[in-house]
């Protein structure tokens, strides 16, 4: 079957010469042909993501057209404004794919609002809500290597598409011929017919106003003289992040020159992920040279941010996603209580794999902490639930350990722009009282205990990878460990058993160990990986590290 598909693509007058050249190059290579054509990229709640190239199992204009026709078929059943918002990041062909999506939607009589330049995830979520769109499309593969691109789909609330809607769209995609099934008009024709319009300045400024409304101490940064190094990692964060920081009074910003401008090849770091040291290396070097108070880096679609803080001895320390989440929660709570802006019955939300230290901080400030499944859409779902009750002002912060944060209800996905603003405001505040981010983190550990959170990832590439991952999860379910690394397992929670958790079904296993440590195992939702999350608690960092190493040494052989 896949050889027939390859032959058809080879004989079809493809509009992208790169694809034609690739097909010629793989002639006779059955393994490569099978990898590209035996399956298709599957559309889920996170949309599509795959390697760029020719074939149904790759990201290209034909896969994008097919996906958009499926989305269009769904939109046409939804009533409303019959409108879709579109944005894109700096990745290879992101702008091409965004325009292709617009052309298919317009050919289906669906109006499009598309950004005239690359803009990040929060801008797409905001535009979807601002224009009361039926859906949104963000062309990005987030922090994946340069050879990847993707297509995130959003519902009318600006949150990633629900399971039910994604299933309908996927069925429509499957019934659409990949090469000839999508309707299409030219981008210019769509503009001329008034079906395609650019996002207006009113929407763009509305986003900035909404972000600035999340300040805890407005005006503080204008007198704090904060010195900052920032890297957009060749992505979409440069304009929105520097704009918002300038607006709140931070002008001393040094941009990492090699990573300043959009470049989908990501020449300085093969994996543009702010969780990874290599992505932050140039920024750290520049921070040390300039004596900056803080270094920030946002990923290509600017929905996640990583930071390094200056220590009293002049060195710099990377801050984990869990630590930033806890620091922001502590800062927002203390600041809003001080300023009298804390809502009644405040709510914060975190993913279940994020640190329990956040629960302790929330309890201290009288904040209800809700833990949800991994994936920011579940945090967005909690905001939507509050909004439906007329209580959206109760939401003060949502975060994931994977460096995603949101501090207001104006969008329904993680936002590195508001996170960058609040991180800088927090650093400026501690500087103004003779303290520092580092000192406050140590005070939090002293008050609540030395929690350590680490994640190990195990890759399973290729067509067989998904089967291997499924086999490992099945083995763990049928052979639950009684002990891990010498620590007795006192509780096992299987999130596929919804009657136990009260949450939607998820492929997640949680092991509670004697002494309070936890191990969580789950497959990644976006990459061919299984992740193991370790939380340990010790009298000091050395003890917590030792326990983590004992646990990971015992568990790692299962993933080999």
Regions found by a protein language model. Name each.
Residues 4-101, 190-191, 195-225, 236:
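An N-terminal, well-structured beta->alpha segment
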Residues 37-57, 141-144, 228, 232-244, ...:
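Conserved phosphate/anionic-ligand binding catalytic regions in large, soluble enzymes, centered on
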């Amino acid at each position: 079957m896949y050889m027939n598909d390859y032959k058809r693509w080879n004989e079809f007058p493809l509009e992208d010469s790169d694809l034609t050249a690739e097909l010629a190059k793989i002639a006779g290579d059955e393994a490569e042909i099978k990898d590209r054509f035996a399956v298709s990229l599957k559309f889920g709640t996170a949309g599509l993501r795959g390697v760029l190239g020719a074939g149904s199992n790759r990201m290209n204009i034909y896969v994008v057209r097919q996906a958009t026709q499926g989305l269009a078929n769904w939109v046409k059943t939804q009533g409303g404004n019959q409108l879709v918002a579109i944005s894109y990041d700096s990745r290879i062909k992101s702008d091409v794919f965004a325009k292709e999506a617009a052309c298919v939607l317009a050919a289906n009589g669906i109006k499009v609002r598309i950004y005239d330049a690359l803009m990040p995830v929060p801008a797409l979520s905001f535009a979807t809500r601002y224009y009361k769109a039926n859906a949104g499309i963000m062309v990005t593969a987030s922090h994946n290597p340069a050879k990847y691109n993707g297509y995130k789909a959003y519902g009318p609330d600006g949150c990633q598409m629900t399971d039910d809607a994604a299933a309908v769209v996927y069925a429509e995609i499957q019934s659409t011929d990949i090469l000839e099934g999508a309707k299409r008009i030219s981008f210019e024709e769509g503009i001329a017919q008034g079906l395609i319009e650019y996002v207006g300045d009113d929407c763009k400024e509305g986003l900035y106003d909404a972000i600035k409304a999340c300040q805890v101490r407005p005006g503080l940064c204008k007198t704090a003289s904060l010195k900052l190094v920032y890297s957009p990692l060749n992505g979409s964060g440069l304009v929105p992040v520097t704009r918002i920081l300038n607006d709140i009074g931070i002008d001393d910003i040094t941009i990492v020159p090699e990573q300043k401008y959009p470049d989908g090849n990501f020449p300085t770091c093969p994996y543009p992920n702010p969780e990874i040291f290599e992505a932050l290396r140039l920024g750290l070097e520049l921070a040390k040279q300039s004596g900056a108070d803080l270094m920030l880096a946002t990923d290509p679609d600017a929905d996640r941010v990583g930071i390094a803080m200056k220590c009293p001895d002049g060195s710099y320390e990377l801050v984990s996603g869990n630590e930033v989440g806890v620091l922001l929660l502590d800062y927002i709570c203390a600041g809003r209580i001080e300023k009298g802006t804390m809502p009644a019955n405040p709510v914060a939300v975190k993913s279940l794999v994020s640190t329990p230290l956040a629960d302790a901080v929330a309890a201290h400030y009288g904040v209800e902490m809700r833990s949800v499944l991994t994936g920011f859409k579940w945090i967005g779902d909690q905001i939507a639930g509050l909004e439906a009750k007329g209580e959206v002002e109760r939401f003060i912060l949502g975060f994931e350990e994977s460096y995603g944060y949101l501090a207001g209800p104006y969008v329904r996905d993680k936002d590195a722009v508001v996170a960058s603003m609040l991180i800088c405001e927090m650093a400026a505040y501690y500087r103004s009282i003779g303290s520092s981010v580092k000192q406050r983190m140590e005070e939090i550990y002293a008050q609540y205990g030395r929690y350590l959170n680490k994640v190990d990832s195990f890759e399973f590439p290729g067509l067989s990878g998904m089967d291997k991952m499924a086999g490992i999860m099945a083995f763990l379910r049928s052979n639950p460990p009684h002990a891990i690394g010498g620590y007795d397992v006192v509780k096992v929670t299987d999130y596929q058993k919804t009657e136990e958790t009260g949450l939607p079904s998820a492929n997640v296993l949680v092991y509670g160990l004697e002494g309070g440590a936890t191990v969580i195992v789950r497959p990644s939702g976006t990459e061919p990986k299984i992740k193991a999350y370790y939380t340990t608690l010790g009298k000091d960092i050395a003890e917590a590290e030792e326990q983590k190493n004992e646990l990971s040494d015992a568990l790692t052989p299962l993933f080999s």
